[in-house]
Regions:
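Positively charged n-region of N-terminal signal peptides that target proteins for export
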Residues: 1-5
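N-terminal signal peptide c-region/cleavage motif recognized by signal peptidases
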Residues: 11-16
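N-terminus-centered regions that define maturation/targeting leaders and the start
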Residues: 18-183
């Protein structure tokens, strides 16, 4: 019995250590740092270039079969729903980065097989920060999920919230990165 308990504790510790090593970073902004104007949305009164930032990750846990990236602004004044800025899923398990500028509507620069969902701007692809003027700094949460399945079966036209639900249901670990922007 003691051997079984020890084995379980050891396995849980190894899993926790593995998940703790899972990291998401960007050479384009520091964790908790300001997001530059070139990544800001172009439209809705914002005048950025709407270029998606570069993202790199490492330390995905054993058993990862694909990834999904969700970018959300919980500070958006939407009655509590926040705002979805980017949704990418079916990223192959072999991928370790998303290059700057890959978030175009056609997703041509994304790792092969990746699919972009519709954002709250109404279309697929990166929709950069664009908070209301004078609303303070918003927190843009980039969450990379390591998934237990190779491919998520998501219907065409699914909302970002539905995609987020399916992603969370299949997630085995997350790596997070926070960026700030206000105007």
């Amino acid at each position: 019995m003691k051997t079984l308990i020890f084995s379980l504790v050891l396995a849980c510790t190894a899993l926790a250590a593995s998940a703790a090593d899972f990291r998401l970073d960007s050479p384009d902004f520091a964790p908790g740092g300001a997001i530059a104007n070139k990544f800001v949305y172009k439209g809705f009164g914002c005048s950025g270039d709407n270029i998606s930032p570069s993202l790199i990750w490492s330390g995905a846990p054993a058993g990862t079969k694909s990834f999904a990236l969700l970018v959300h602004d919980a500070d958006a004044p939407t009655g509590g729903a926040g705002w979805w800025h980017w949704v990418v899923y079916n990223i192959p398990a072999s991928a370790t980065k998303i290059a700057q500028g890959s978030g175009t509507a056609d997703g041509a620069g994304l790792p092969a097989g990746s699919v972009q969902g519709r954002t709250d701007f109404g279309s697929p692809g990166w929709g950069g920060p664009c908070p209301p003027v004078g609303h303070g700094k918003h927190h843009y949460r980039f969450t990379l999920h390591a998934l237990k399945v190779e491919k998520l079966e998501i219907p065409d036209g699914a909302t970002a919230a539905l995609i987020g639900y399916v992603v969370n249901d299949n997630s085995i670990a997350t790596a997070k990165l926070l960026g700030l922007y206000g105007r």
